[in-house]
Each structure stands twice: as C-alpha cells, then as structure tokens.
Amino acid sequence: MSSKIKFVALLIVVISLLLNNAQSTREILSAEICGWNDPAVHCKTKEDCFEKCGGRPAKKVFCVRPGDHSYDRLCCCRA
C-alpha cells in the first residue's frame, strides 16, 4: 500500500514539473515578454543581447527564434 502512495506522489511531482516547464517555454517565446515591439536585434548567442537588455542578469537574457519556421534569432529580454 505505501509503495502505491509513493508512486502516485512521484507521478504527481513529475507531471507538475513537466507542465511548469512547458509554461516557462511559452512565456519565453511570447512577443509581449520579449519586447519584440521594439526594434528587433538579431543575435547568434545570448552574449549578443546583453547591451540591448540593459544590464539584466544573464538568466533573463535569451537569443531565441520568434517562431517555429523562423531561421533568424532575436534578443529576448525578460523583466
């Protein structure tokens, strides 16, 4: 009985982590959060975005593709 409870608890934790990861990915790719209404800054690495992002910590600066079919990468500055 206790092994079933442990298994269910572990399953709940794993599912919640997967859902949280998917939500974070959608948030990063959101044009509203990334500020793509501003002039777009093309990048190859996140280091290319530090100046555009105005000294934000490295964990809030991204170089991402704005869409599934885009080959260009743009700077994304999270608040």
Swiss-Prot record:
Gene Ontology CC: one annotated term: extracellular region
Keyword presence, Acyltransferase: no
Predominant subcellular localization, coarse grouping: secreted
InterPro entries assigned to the protein according to its UniProt record, in alphabetical order: DEFL (IPR010851)
The keyword Disulfide bond belongs to this UniProt entry's keyword annotation: yes
Disulfide bonds: 34-77, 43-63, 49-75, 53-76
Entry protein name: Defensin-like protein 272
Organism placement in taxonomy: Eukaryota, Viridiplantae, Streptophyta, Embryophyta, Tracheophyta
